[in-house]
Amino acid sequence: MIKQRTLKRVVQTTGVGLHTGKKVTLTLRPTSANTGIIYRRTDLYPPVDLQVNVKSVGNTVLCTCLINEYGVQIFTVEHLSAAQAGLGIDNIIIELNAPEVPIMDGSASPFVCLLLDAGIEELNSAKKFLRLKQTVRVEDGEKWAELRPFNGFTLDFTIDFNHPAINVDTQHCFFNFSSASFVHNISRARTFGFMRDIKDLQSRGFALGGSFNSAIIIDDYRVLNEDGLRFDDEFVRHKMLDAIGDLFMCGHNLIGSFIAFKSGHTLNNKLLKTVLSCQEAWELATFSNASDLPLVF
């Protein structure tokens, strides 16, 4: 059978919170089968656990945030979530001594490296996939996102920026998921922001950890980072990375096709909630043999 995954050993790193600008220590711990993904705030006494599921997703305006019934929050989980989805990690305990996951370089790549350094352990329990049975679509004005039945996992994403630094030919990307392809082609794509917006956010106490080391920064004409872009279409690739992380808030890798136009955290989360609210639209699937699995990890 295709088995659930956790880590082989504990690993730790430090970084800075994107919005708080404060140092954060992140510790990843292995755990048992069917535990799921648990975030633990160790800066609180006693420590507070937040179980990842679609109901625990709170604010999605600037990032994806988890919140429990007592108002305890953890911000900016989407890049770490994407790394877990990309490597198929089902069970993990994520400890933070702050209310925010560190932004690192603005991509999921540092988290992928951390997870691979920990090693992946298979558990003696069947891995459950969320498989689409019906097409579900959500819209917000001209923006929309859709999940369709498909025997595999693909993403088809289009952004629409009228900006000299974002060429019209680089605003669409199609991605056929495999773990190796995710690591090489999606995980390295960084978040991006416009200089004018960053200054406004920082004046209001947000994006205090934003810098050229943690994002692609754009003025009205060009990319300001000295090292430029990692991919010609890095902007849309990062939007796909965000979507992979947001869709993993259900705690399962998806089997289906995701198509979106100008979608973001809010619409991605709305789509996932809409799917899960319709019992006829999805099912949990397990696989006895690797040859039957339509995804490659």
Curated annotation (Swiss-Prot):
Q: Which InterPro entries match?
A: Ribosomal_Su5_D2-typ_SF, UDP-acyl_GlcNac_deAcase, UDP-acyl_GlcNac_deAcase_C, UDP-acyl_N-AcGlcN_deAcase_N
Which Pfam families does the entry link to? Answer: LpxC (PF03331)
One GO BP annotation here? lipid A biosynthetic process
Q: Give the UniProt keywords, A-Z.
A: Hydrolase, Lipid A biosynthesis, Lipid biosynthesis, Lipid metabolism, Metal-binding, Zinc
Cofactor field: Zn(2+)
Q: Could you tell me one molecular function GO term of this UniProt entry?
A: metal ion binding
Its recorded name reads: UDP-3-O-acyl-N-acetylglucosamine deacetylase
